[in-house]
Amino acid sequence: MNTADDNAKQRLQELIGPDYTLQWIVGHGGMSTVWLADDNVNDREVAVKVLRPEFSDNTEFLSRFRNEARAAENIHSEHVVTTYDYREVADPAGHTFCFIVLEYIRGESLADMLEREGALPEELALDVMEQAAHGLSVIHRMGLVHRDIKPGNMLITANGILKITDFGIAKAAASVPLTRTGMVVGTAQYVSPEQAQGHQVTPASDVYSLGVVGYEMLSGRRPFTGDSSVSVAIAHINEAPPQMPTSVSAQARELIGIALRKDPARRFADGNELARAVSAVRLGNRPPQPHSPAVQATAVAPSPSASTAMLGQVARPTTSVPASPTVLPERQEKRGSGVGLGLLIAAVIAAVIGGIIWAGATGVFSGDSEETTTPETITQTVTPTETTTSEEPTLAPPPVQPTRQPVPTPDETPTRLPTTTQESPTRVSPTPEETDEPGEQTTPGGQPPLSTLPTSLGWQNNQGGTGNQGNPNTTGNPANPGTPGTTGGNGTGNAGGNSPDAADELLMSLDELMNVGGNQ
């Protein structure tokens, strides 16, 4: 950390006060920065999410930041990142300085996991869905709608526990929107049809978004893509999702199909109904229909299962390395070591010894060989991560009966270390099958009627919000990626925001929207 950074950190520390001691930055979001800090009062690590100075005088951003703290402060669930504190102080220039103190989660955001793994095994994907649905059930019982459920705002700890973060655009179901009438806030890839049109959002809107996440986990791709946020949103409004791979069970496909119904009244009503339905599918049953007695009883939070433990093994803590290496946690220094390095060294030594023995046997060093022998080059590519993938070195042991042109035949291949990375599933063209959803009505060109489109669309494409990009074991407090990282993602350590969708705030007029739709 250079002098300028030290000075900036010192000024920030003075504003925060003595209760929290800043360590280093673990995540960045669209409107905030997340620090790992020590809670000196309660003797614990926390994620401190600081609103960026350039937004502190912006009424809309300040309202969102306050809303995030207030919306989450009374939510207590194992599957929701905990908010500990919120403060506003005036800086020397008279500007408002705001920060939220959140639970610091060591782990990884679901967004980072999906980027690395592709599709997840069905049991793991359903485990994630059930845990997330339980978190949503608590949020919905508090009368809130999250409005931005996506992989970047879902953090997974080393124990396989999923936590929802980033309440920056959450709202009470009966309250007025944070933004002006006709404006949409959310992430286009996961937005519900009613939210995309600027209509009233309900808990069923969060169910739809989680259904999109489930589709992505099981299929290895999102149901709708496009060259702009608006084109993706229009697809959510008008198009039926593509068939899922036939490798996914019929029960799981039916579950996702119900969650992705265009009409919110035909979906599961809230997180509780969805949790009950996922539980039934995990037992091998068909999902119960929405609003039926089977899904209206209060869902019981699942006990950690074998799949939960496996999920924790798949989750890989991603750490945002501080500028000064002297403050790195000791456990991070061990990440590059292990059996893999030992096997690599052993393989290289074996190859060298084998080459020497073979050379002696064939007379390469004796001077009586008339041929020029070019030793085989052994190439080993090593990537210092837990999922190291390297080319297997070819070992050339001495042949039993060497000839003048020996051709070494490998007879031993170093054992590869097991890795949690799974092969990308083979794309299987699904056979046509009936869906429970009739074709949606569209206008010519696939565009929704003018009356269904909001005056403008404002997409917050932050796949992780502000997450705490955390240390190993982080769900991040990127894995608090907002709370990124914590509320926004306690993500890779509360950095809920390192995701493919991190990004831009887009405001588009109706004319621009029509142009985009017409050019598709």
UniProtKB/Swiss-Prot annotation:
Q: What class of enzyme is it?
A: transferase
| CDD domains xref list | STKc_PknB_like
Write the record's keywords in alphabetical order, separated by commas: ATP-binding, Kinase, Nucleotide-binding, Serine/threonine-protein kinase, Transferase
Comp. bias regions, Low complexity:
374-394, 440-449, 469-484
Biased region (Gly residues) positions are 485-496
Positions that bind ATP: V26, G27, H28, G29, G30, M31, S32, T33, V34, K49
| Family per similarity comment | Belongs to the protein kinase superfamily. Ser/Thr protein kinase family.
Q: What is this protein called?
A: Serine/threonine-protein kinases drp72
Q: Which organism is it from?
A: Corynebacterium efficiens (strain DSM 44549 / YS-314 / AJ 12310 / JCM 11189 / NBRC 100395)
